């Protein structure tokens, strides 16, 4: 935890669960969708649990509950393993296959991430075919064939469920995206600092969801936080 961090616990809120298929989604599908700042926990009949972060859209096939498609946002999967029917997640057209596991998948406008807390997954079995064990984090940016694999603390994977956000050399734009997803606040980042790396831990509180985020972010991220009519804007501190 870094000094001046955001302290507290995250409270789950009610989410939107659409049983009626929207335009472009087959009627056999179920859509689970959360607004920014909301969480949702889905229990499947086989005992598998899926926790949804804020601003997330997940599609489940009614005829095959062992298949999910993450269209945007973040979800933590706690899968009851079945070797004869492996659980699969589709993110931006890439399959992630469970091998008895607890894992987190993030889908943003820039790319995808997979982090494993327990067990293992097979990422893109028909392409890159990368096996990820507990404590591994995979990143792949849209439009790139490069798959980056690094270390992650298994204990922090899916920490967003309790408001704990932990980073190691993460760009500020990623931190801002996570905070927006967690709190419901609109947060933009100046291009001059968007790729600045941040290492540390932030714990989001219920108070942050009520609008106190700006007062704390400046010291935590070493930026100037400007209030705008539609949210917050992070930029470099003025030189002294």
What are these regions (language model features)?
Residues 2-29:
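Single-pass transmembrane signal-anchor helices and their membrane-water interface zones
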Residues 28-49:
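Short extracytoplasmic/periplasmic juxtamembrane "stem" segments immediately C-terminal to an N-terminal membrane anchor
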Residues 37, 53-57, 73, 92, ...:
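Tight coil/turn sites that cap or link beta-strands
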Residues 45-46, 54, 71, 117-118:
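A cytosolic small-molecule/anion-sensing beta-strand core signal
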Residues 45-48, 63-68, 108-114:
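Edge/loop elements at the starts and ends of beta-strands within beta-rich repeat scaffolds
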Residues 55-75:
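Short Gly/aromatic-enriched secondary-structure transition segments
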Residues 86-181, 188:
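Short, polar/charged, low-complexity connector loops/linkers at domain or secondary-structure junctions
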Residues 145-240:
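N-terminal export/assembly leaders
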